Curated annotation (Swiss-Prot):
Domain HTH marR-type: 1-116
Region of interest called Solute-binding, as start-end residue ranges on this chain: 163-492
GO molecular function (one): peptide transmembrane transporter activity
Endpoints of the signal sequence: none
Keywords: Activator, DNA-binding, Repressor, Transcription, Transcription regulation
Name by which UniProt lists this protein: HTH-type transcriptional regulator SgrR
Gene that specifies this protein: sgrR
Entry keyword annotation includes Repressor: yes
InterPro entries with a match to the protein in the record: SBP_5, SBP_5_dom, SgrR_HTH_N, Tscrpt_reg_SgrR
Disulfide bonds: none
Gene3D superfamilies in alphabetical order: Periplasmic binding protein-like II
Length: 551
């Protein structure tokens, strides 16, 4: 019998007997474990050989045998749990232990650095699965970060300073306002072994031509080996940065024929996906990466949904048994905000917008929040922390306003917390707030109508590029805010847009109402080096490393 199955049987027997040694019979024990008398005898003999118990059998009708436990079920369960943790089999761990609080405690105790068979392993605890990692699809903040570890693009943006750097393309030049040329590295390999070809690059960029920010790409050709020419329908000063974004990352041209590509993608980046389930994401350093090989050999993201009910204030890399330390913290470049839907009567009503902006002001939300959230929330008066565009002006409740509908995407605990506070405040004004949770894909597409949407945005460096790029690429915003997005995109591409003024107009019209800036925190080990928190609340895995202990 496999060891794991035998351990489960022993734990069950120990629990049924309440851990007490006793006089009993094979028939009674077989009934407890719902098995045959013969199988029960085999189990007892095997468990005795393992040193877990002794079985002193008595022969004869009416005689009772002696069962003595030498090992406790709890100790064996702990040993089994430790084995499962080392093997990263979190789903089986949850089934074995059962108690969610105990599972969480065990996971936390194993976070951070592990050194196994000469490999450095980093373990991270997260609250939800990361199942969709497909560039060009609707990706949330953490999926965006993970995709950058798996894929490469023609260019890349330095997360620390926002500067443009070479990636698959080692140089590029603007030949004319409508013509750019990129020079690509040879010898780049995908994780599944095949060498990258120009057809992969061309196919990857053509597949995103339907996205708003890439719709001005007219043609992509390769005039000579490892040279790529991109022709545009309108000038774009941001094109090199645009080609470093996640939608423009390079996929193998046969990606649609590869099994479960969205959850098990294949790229050319520093890490390759080894496992991606509802309980765990495991990525491993790619030895044939064309850049510097990652210093951390393996990153395990353990998924424990139960921690979603806690304030989402930090990325936990190290458990409390060690020297837990706040490594970095920063106020996010972005905010939670309300989006009014101009497609509904109440969402388009300026009086409703003004009054909701007044009663659901950032200070009101923070005031009514629990202390654990107050420590992480900062009132927002603009889309960025440095902006003060919003003004809270006293406004009268519109006559006849009795209800409003608020919609947000699911699997985000703070959405529920903020919505609950809003519901409480509006109820005090005799307004019922109907709350709807939908999938992230539904939220992103924005085909459903709602009076108000509760959203969040995290902008990456450089901000003068990413702020408009982020807002423009979310279809929901284009559905809700009736402005000429294409004309604004053309001005942005030409460098003619005053971004601060453009955002101020959105806030002044109450199309978007900033609510809260969130403190992002990473907790980890003192021995970790090269860790620089990015604006998504994560860090570049390939640049981090563990310092060895002092000799």
């Amino acid at each position: 019998m496999p060891s794991a199955r035998l351990q489960q049987q022993f734990i069950r027997l120990w629990q049924c007997c309440e851990g007490k040694s006793q006089d009993t019979t094979l028939n009674e024990l077989a009934a407890l474990l719902s098995c045959s008398r013969r199988h029960m005898r085999t189990l007892l003999n095997t468990m005795q050989d393992r040193g877990w118990l002794t079985w002193e059998a008595e022969v004869g009708r009416g005689k009772r045998s002696r069962l003595t436990f030498l090992y406790t079920g709890l100790a064996l369960q702990q040993q089994r749990a430790e084995d499962l943790l080392e093997q990263d089999r979190i789903d089986q761990l949850v089934q074995l232990v059962g108690d969610k609080a105990t599972v969480r405690q065990m996971l936390v105790s194993h976070l951070g650095r592990s050194f196994r068979q000469g490999r450095h392993i980093l373990r991270v605890l997260y609250y939800r699965p990361l199942r969709n990692l497909l560039p060009g699809s609707a990706l949330r903040r953490s999926e965006t970060h993970i995709a950058r570890q798996i894929f490469s693009s023609l260019t890349r943006i330095n997360e620390e300073n926002g500067e443009l750097e070479a990636d698959i393309a080692h140089h590029w030049q603007q030949i004319s306002p409508l013509h750019w040329r990129f020079f690509l590295r040879p010898g780049v390999h995908f994780h599944h072994g095949r060498e990258l070809e120009m057809d992969d690059v061309i196919a990857s960029l053509k597949r995103i031509n339907t996205l708003p920010l890439y719709s001005h790409i007219a043609d992509i050709v390769s005039p000579t080996p490892w040279t790529l020419d991109i022709h545009l329908t309108q000038p774009d000063r941001w094109l090199p940065l645009l080609l470093g974004q996640v939608p423009a990352m390079i996929l193998p041209r046969e990606w649609e024929t590869l099994s479960n590509f969205a959850s098990h993608p294949i790229g050319t980046g520093p890490y390759a996906v080894i496992r991606n389930t509802t309980n765990q994401l495991k990525i491993q350093a790619f030895d044939d990466f064309f850049g510097y090989r990652a210093l951390i050999d393996e990153v395990n993201v353990w998924v424990l949904p139960e921690i979603a009910d806690e304030p989402a204030g930090g990325l936990m890399l190290k458990g409390p048994q060690g020297e837990e330390k706040e490594i970095e913290s920063r106020l996010e470049e972005g905010c939670y905000y309300l989006l009014f839907d101009s497609r509904t009567h109440r969402g388009a009503n300026q009086q409703v917008r003004d009054w909701v902006n007044y009663v659901l002001s950032p200070t009101n939300l923070v005031y009514f929040a629990e202390e654990q959230y107050q420590q992480l929330w900062f009132p927002a008066y603009g889309l960025l922390p440095r902006w003060h565009h919003a003004r809270t002006i006293k406004s009268e409740k519109p006559a006849g306003l009795e209800s409003l509908t608020l919609t947000f995407y699911q699997d985000h605990s703070e959405h529920r917390v903020i919505a609950g506070i809003m519901q409480q405040i509006l109820a005090s004004h005799q307004v019922t707030l109907e709350i709807k949770e939908i999938s992230y894909d539904q939220w992103h597409e924005g085909e459903i109508e709602s009076d108000i949407w509760l959203n969040s945005a995290n902008f990456t460096l450089p901000l003068d590029f990413s702020l408009f790029a982020h807002l423009c690429e979310v279809p929901l915003l284009q559905h809700c805010i009736p402005i000429d997005w294409q004309a604004d995109a053309a001005r942005w591409r030409n460098g003619e847009m005053n971004l601060a003024n453009w955002c101020q107009q959105l806030v002044a019209s109450k199309a978007m109402v900033p609510l809260i800036h969130h403190w992002l925190i990473i907790q980890g080990q003192r021995s970790m080096r090269g860790l620089r928190m990015n604006t998504l609340g994560w860090f570049d895995f390939k640049s981090a490393w563990f310092a060895p202990p002092d000799p």
